Swiss-Prot record:
Protein name: Cell division protein ZipA
One of the protein's GO biological processes: division septum assembly
Encoding gene (name): zipA
Disulfide bonds: none
Membrane topology: Single-pass type I membrane protein
Main localization (coarse): membrane
Native source organism of the sequence: Shewanella pealeana (strain ATCC 700345 / ANG-SQ1)
UniProt-annotated location(s): Cell inner membrane
Subunit relationships: Interacts with FtsZ via their C-terminal domains.
Region of interest (Disordered), ranges: 165-188
Cytoplasmic face residues: 28-325
Periplasmic topology ranges: 1-6
Keywords (A to Z) from UniProt: Cell cycle, Cell division, Cell inner membrane, Cell membrane, Membrane, Transmembrane, Transmembrane helix
Amino acid sequence: MENFQLVLLLIGVIAIIGVLVHGFWSIRKQQPKEYKQSPMADISRERRDAQGFDNDGIGAVRVVKNTQQDDEPETIDDEQRDPLATETVTDAFELSGTPATKVNKTRVEPSLIPQESVFATDMPVQESLFGADEISVAAPVITEQAVRTEPEPRLQPVFKPEPQLEPVELKPDPIVEPAPKQEQTEELGEPRDVLVLHVVAKEGEELSGAELLPCLLTLNFKFGEMNIFHRHEDNAGTGKVLFSMANMVKPGVFDPDNMEQFSTQGVVLFMTLPCYGEALMNFSIMLNSAHQIADDLGGVVLDGGRDEWLESTKQNYIQRIRAQA
C-alpha cells in the first residue's frame, strides 16, 4: 500500500512539472520579439541631439587648455565637477587614442538651455519600448442583456394520481401459545441402595438449631415434605430432589419456627440410588455439604455405620454408586 501511494505521488509531481513547463513554453512562444529583448537596451545607449545633449540634458564637457601649458590640463575643482561629466571625460580618454585638439585660451562655458525646450524641440520622441506590436487587452463589455438573467421557468410538479388500493383486511395470525413443558418424569423404581452420612456433635456437646438454620440456607437446602430439609436440582429450591437431611433423633423432623430453641445430637444426610441426575455429582455435593456443616457447627462427619469417615470409605461409596449405574 505504501509503494502504491509513493507511485501515485511521483506521477502527480511529474504531471504538475509537465503542466508548468508547457505553460511557460506557451507564454514564451506567444510573446512578441520586443518582450524577449531587454527593454533597457535602448535606454542604456547614449543618445545625443544635434547640440550635444544627452537624454538627461547634460552636454559633453569641453576641456580648454592653456597655450603655454600644452602638456598640463586645466584642473577643475571637485565641487564644480559634474560626476556624470567626469565619467564621460574618463571614458573619452580611455577610448580615444588621439590627443585632443588645442582650442583658444578662453574657457567657453556650456550654455544651459532649459530642458523643457530641449525635449520639446530637438530631442526625438522616444519610441515605445514595446513598439507597434503592443498588446492591447480589451476589457470585457458587460451589456444589460448579459446582466439581465432570464428567470428560469419554474417547473410545476406533475402529480400522477396513484390508483387507490382497496383496503385489505389483514387477519391477525392466531397466537400459538407454547405448550407447557412437561416435566420428564423418570420412573426410578424402588431404591436399591441408600448412601448415608452423619454429622454429629462432639462428645458432651450438641448442635444448635440457631446456627444450623443459616448454614442450611447457605447450602441451598429447602424445608419441605416430611418436615425435613431437601437439596434440589436448582439452587432456588426447584426441581427434583437430589438428597435430603433429617434429624438424627426421633422422630427425625425439624420445626423451622422454633429453630432457635432447637438442639440435637446430630443430623443425617441420605441419598437413594438410583437418583435423578448424575449420581457421582450428587454424592459430591452431599459430601461437601456434610463437611461444611461439621466445620460451621464444630461437628464430626461419620459414615452410615457411624464410623469415622476415611478416604477408603469414600472409595467404597463411589463403587456402590458405579454398581447402580
